[in-house]
């Protein structure tokens, strides 16, 4: 009897994997997304969504990637949103000097409150700023990270140039985002989440489907980095997302 439990269990897993990976990748034309969050209701809804399990797992993955580079010095979280990631970094890597940067003052209020609630407000600061004109001196940042922000960048080449400018020599950047050429199965799942699961305020702005549709492909990102004169870029693609990392040489 145990044999058949294992057999059908393994068979079920194989069928699910075939369904997921058997679907071809989508070839959508990119649609632009909003650059920042000005609506308090949308900001609050985004804050709630970041507490869902997939986002918690994502933050763990980013921090594990971050630990691989022996992080030290000043770290900027570009597009820090409501501060979940930067606060967790403060808890896991307390030696870093942390700065959260976001274009939306509305969402930063949630980040500041989270830092206070976690008693981490002394370990970080938050700034309102544009990714294309960051409020930092040239060659002043050791590490720059960004999670689910790339697809909001209107001029990604200019942002990558700015990243290169503010990083110190041998400074590192690590960027995580969706990839628009995700498999059709994932598009179906995100469409379901957008229409059924998320708070009403996010349904109105068609999120998170809008973020997926406005994301870039790995090939496009490589082209942006090349136009920004960035070298030694590594893109690690996954089912529906990608990690982009590099150093300033």
Where are each of the predicted segments found?
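Conserved class I S-adenosyl-L-methionine
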Residues: 6-70
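C-terminal alpha-helical "lid/dimerization" subdomain adjacent to the S-adenosyl-L-methionine
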Residues: 25-30, 85, 176-244
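Short glycine-centered segments of the SAM/dcSAM-binding site in methyltransferase folds
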Residues: 74, 171-172
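Class I SAM-dependent methyltransferase SAM/SAH-binding core
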Residues: 76, 82-133
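A short acidic, Gly/Pro-enriched loop at the edge of an enzyme's catalytic core
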Residues: 132-143
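A short SAM/SAH-binding and catalytic strip from SAM-dependent methyltransferases
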Residues: 143-155
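Short N-terminal helix/helix-N-cap motif within the alpha/beta-hydrolase-1
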Residues: 154-158, 183
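A short glycine-rich, Lys/Arg-flanked "PGG" loop and its adjoining helix->strand segment in the class I
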Residues: 157-169
């Amino acid at each position: 009897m145990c044999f058949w439990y294992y057999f059908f269990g393994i068979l079920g897993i194989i069928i699910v994997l075939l369904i997921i990976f058997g679907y071809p990748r989508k070839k959508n034309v990119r649609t632009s997304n909003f650059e920042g969050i000005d609506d308090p209701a949308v900001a609050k809804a985004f804050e709630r969504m970041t507490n869902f399990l997939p986002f918690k797992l994502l933050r763990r993955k980013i921090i594990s990637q971050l630990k691989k580079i022996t992080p030290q010095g000043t770290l900027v979280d570009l597009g820090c949103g409501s501060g979940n990631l930067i606060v967790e970094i403060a808890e896991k890597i307390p030696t870093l000097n942390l700065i959260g940067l976001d274009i939306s003052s509305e969402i930063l209020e949630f980040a500041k409150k989270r830092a206070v609630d976690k008693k981490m407000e002394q370990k970080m600061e938050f700034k309102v700023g544009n990714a294309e004109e960051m409020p930092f001196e040239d060659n002043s940042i050791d590490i720059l990270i960004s999670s689910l922000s790339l697809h909001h960048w209107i001029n990604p080449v200019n942002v990558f140039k700015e990243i290169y400018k503010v990083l110190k020599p041998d400074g590192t950047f690590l960027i995580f985002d969706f990839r628009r050429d995700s498999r059709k199965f994932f598009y179906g799942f995100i469409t379901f989440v957008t229409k059924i699961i998320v708070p009403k305020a996010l349904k109105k702005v068609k999120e998170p489907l809008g973020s997926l549709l406005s994301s870039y492909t790995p090939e496009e990102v490589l082209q942006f980095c090349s136009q920004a004169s960035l070298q030694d870029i590594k893109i690690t693609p996954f089912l529906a997302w990608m990690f982009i990392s590099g150093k300033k040489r």
